[in-house]
Every structure is written in C-alpha cells, then in structure tokens.
Amino acid sequence: REAYKALKDRILARAAQNSNHPDKSGDKNMAGQIDARLVELGIELPQAAAAVANYVPYVIDGGQVWIAGQVPFWNGAVKYTGSVGDAVSLDDAIDAARVCALNILAQAKAALGDLDRVTRIVKLGGFVNAVPGFTDYPKVINGASDLMVEIFGDKGMHARSAVGAAGLPLGVPVEIDAVIAFT
C-alpha cells in the first residue's frame, strides 16, 4: 500500500506541477476541459486507426468502452519496432507506451465523441516485447499510465497489468489495451 501511495503521489505531483491542472481531489469543473488540457500539455491526438484484422477498435458495453490493443502507430506508420533491450531502448519503449496511450485516447474520442465524457480510466493492459531477462515491464507501461494521470488527474488512476511477450503484432515493442468508464 505504501508503494502504491508513493507512486500515486509521484504521478499526481508531476501532473499538478502545471498550475492550471485540476487538483487531485477530482475537480468537478474538469468537464468540458479535456481538449483544453491536451492543448495545454502540447498534445495532439492522432486519428483513430482502423482495425487491421478481424476485430473492432472498440466496444461499448453499458457505461464502459473497451479499447482493443493499440500499438505505437503514428502518422500512418509504426513508430517503433523491435524488442526492448535490443533494438529498442528503455526510454524509447516508454515513449512507445505513451504513443499507445495517445492511440487509446483517439479511439475513446472516436467512440464517445468527446473525452469529457470519461469518468475513469479503469484499466490498462500492457504487453512488452523484450529480450529474455528484461523485467522492467512496469517502467515501460508507466509511459501510458503517467500520461493518463497528466491528462485526467485522479480520474486517470487505474488498475493495470504489465507483462512480457515473446513478440507482438507488426514487430512492435509495446501494445496496450484499455477499459474506460464514461457517462
């Protein structure tokens, strides 16, 4: 519990460094401000990518949108390929996870029409293609987790898995899926 609290406090402190960011108490005035927050952070979302196989990019069920696994796809191309610890550095893997998170948000916006409808990032499932012996999967997926908290504040705190994989589609180093609650 103490480790989780320390991690949460670190992420929230980093997110709150910008004085215009809603505080970690879950400011109700956040509605209508997510696009403004993205601009404030200098973040531009990519276009939501179409599915490349026999699946859909998202499914809405009740008050949740389930986002299919997103890879580090940017400007029409895969941004990173290879295994972490070989062709991909830890820093590049963290950035790849961040790109995956941006693609998750692009899919959420396509599904919901407006990211202001998001009430909670419920869960991220992270997969890391890495060399044998690599164990820093949580550090890699923090690239996505940190971004969610930077954008959504306390609503961005989520459950998560971060696991290793012997390979991922298109040879990417990271793939992340998500469950997002909305109104």
Regions found by a protein language model. Name each.
Residues 17-29:
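Short, Lys/Arg-enriched N-terminal segments with co-localized hydrophobic residues
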